[in-house]
Amino acid sequence: MELDLETFLVALYVIVDDIYQSAIKPWMPACGGPPAQMSDSEVLCLGLAAQWRSGVPWQSERGIMRYGRKHRRHLFPTVLTQSAFNRRLRRRWGAFSLIQAAVADQLAQGAYDVMDGFPIPVAHGARSFNPGWLADIARIGQGGNDRYFYGVRMMMVIHQNGVATGWALASGNVPERWVAELLFSTRAGVPGLQGPLDAQGHKPKVLPPEEWMAVVPSGGAASNKPILSDGGFRGDDGLAHWANAYGVQVCPLPKAAPRAERHWFSSARQVVDTTFANLTESFGLKYPGAHSTWGLLTRVAAKVAAYNLGIMINRLLGRPDFAFATLIV
């Protein structure tokens, strides 16, 4: 079953409003003054729908506002100006992480999670290696088949069925181990960069990077499930540190694993490639087009939340989880 565009927007709004009322509104501070022209649920719904890249006539927040103003005034009678809409989105960016977590709580079932890093370039072509937008946080890094990129690095934990459970961002030149450290410490409620300590337990063996890292509540809920990782996370010191400090069991493939174990491990981790491919193709995670740090955090959080919601809608309709490209007709 597919959805026409109007039915999709209505379904998305109903789901978002239900989550907002139960998981977000109770945490919102009381505000005085006149009522807002658009409700938070309407703003969040449009901000999430704007991340879709398949079956929709828009490619950005500006595009969906233009579309809503021209074609869907019966669904959204009061449409904010573009600048006001952008401000509301940035102020509510944390709501996207709460939506992501609420959906993950409902959909994530199974025995293990999977973790991997993902480069997010922020500029195309020659501009990729010159300062521009996000010049204070974007850096040249290596990732994605050992290619260089100019942007930021994402570390994500994904459930075995493909549902995103948490993520962290850092400058492109920050090693993946430190981005994972930030993610795990955030999940444990003590965000920071400590790393393994020396034999006396006083000083870190390796000093943490000084580049930008987003210390924000995007890591998701703590879990006792084992996390499968690639071989780059091997090392007894780091694995023991994460287990002791944050209660996280990271399981990289052993070097001397037998062929059958390597085959199972590779198959189990295939969901990582599927997830990042869908985030890129159906939700535009690469080249997010943000001009500021908060704009980048808002868009990344919205894209991951939209991805989880897409899986939820597909399941409600009895469709394959990752059939995003054919959901809207």
Q: Where are the model-predicted features located?
A:
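Short alpha-helical elements
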Residues: 1-329
